[in-house]
């Protein structure tokens, strides 16, 4: 029996990743490095013989453009794609746009680590009259007041990501289709926590690098049996460590 696989990829480096700023739902594009990372991710998948039947991504351009680059490298630009806000990055509330290192200097490394990586801790809320509040963005016009976040913890992110997985993505995988998901550091952490049944302390230390394909293999009951990155292990570890260090004071 063929092994069922799922590919997850965090978007390539964004302009605000490069500037070390909290991004959340702000719709910033890829940096030049990020575009190269996305292209390299597609090449890795091509080299390993991957091809897909369906793709999912968020409604934020850094993930969308990453997916486009990956599919272009695979010569699968025609692939059907579903975009959903439920795969968006975690909403960082009033931290969105702030420099992470400067915020750590003000509040301390541990507080910023908890805001970035803690399970149930939410950053300070946005007010609804703040221009950064998603209720002002037409792409979210169909969302209810309850669905429009003013801030999110990882726990709250899980509340939207996991139902989307179980109700939308997983049934397609069960039908035999080969699926790729291009999303964000925290929406993917939310999914990884669920798939691997990670504890809160364990997920605190998980950092997903930009632009590196993460492959899951499932058994006949669609339970994960293996998770691994494609690419050079030392380079991937260095990229993950760099993600962890973004929230530390200089």
From Swiss-Prot:
The record marks 184 as: Transition state stabilizer. Pathway: Carbohydrate degradation; glycolysis; pyruvate from D-glyceraldehyde 3-phosphate: step 3/5. It catalyses: (2R)-2-phosphoglycerate = (2R)-3-phosphoglycerate. InterPro entries: His_Pase_superF_clade-1, His_PPase_superfam, PG/BPGM_mutase_AS, Phosphogly_mut1. CDD domains: HP_PGM_like. Catalyzes the interconversion of 2-phosphoglycerate and 3-phosphoglycerate. GO terms for molecular function: phosphoglycerate mutase activity. It comes from the Bacteria. Homodimer. The keyword Isomerase applies. It is an enzyme of class 5 (isomerase). The active site is at 11 (tele-phosphohistidine intermediate), 89 (proton donor/acceptor). This is 2,3-bisphosphoglycerate-dependent phosphoglycerate mutase.
């Amino acid at each position: 029996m063929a092994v069922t696989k799922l590919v997850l990829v965090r978007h390539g480096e964004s302009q605000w990743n490069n500037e070390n700023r909290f991004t959340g739902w702000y719709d910033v594009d890829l940096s030049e490095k990020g575009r190269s990372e996305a292209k390299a991710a597609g090449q890795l998948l091509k080299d390993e013989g991957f091809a897909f039947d369906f793709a999912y991504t968020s409604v934020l351009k850094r993930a969308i453009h990453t997916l486009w680059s990956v599919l272009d490298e695979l010569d699968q630009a025609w692939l059907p794609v579903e975009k959903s806000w439920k795969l968006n990055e975690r909403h960082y509330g009033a931290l969105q746009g702030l420099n992470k290192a400067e915020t750590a200097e003000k509040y301390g490394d541990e507080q910023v680590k908890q805001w970035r990586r803690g399970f149930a801790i939410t950053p300070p809320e946005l007010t609804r009259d703040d221009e950064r509040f998603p209720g002002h963005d037409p792409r979210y016009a169909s969302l209810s007041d309850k669905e429009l976040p003013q801030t999110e913890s990882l726990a709250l992110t899980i509340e939207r990501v996991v139902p989307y997985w179980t109700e939308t993505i997983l049934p397609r995988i069960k039908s035999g289709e080969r699926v790729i998901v291009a999303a964000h550091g925290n929406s993917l952490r939310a999914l990884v926590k669920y798939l691997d049944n990670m504890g809160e302390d364990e997920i605190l230390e998980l950092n997903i690098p930009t632009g590196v394909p993460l492959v899951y293999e499932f058994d006949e009951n669609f339970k994960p049996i293996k998770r691994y990155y494609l690419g050079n292990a030392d380079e991937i570890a260095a990229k993950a460590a760099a993600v962890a260090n973004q929230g530390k004071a200089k």
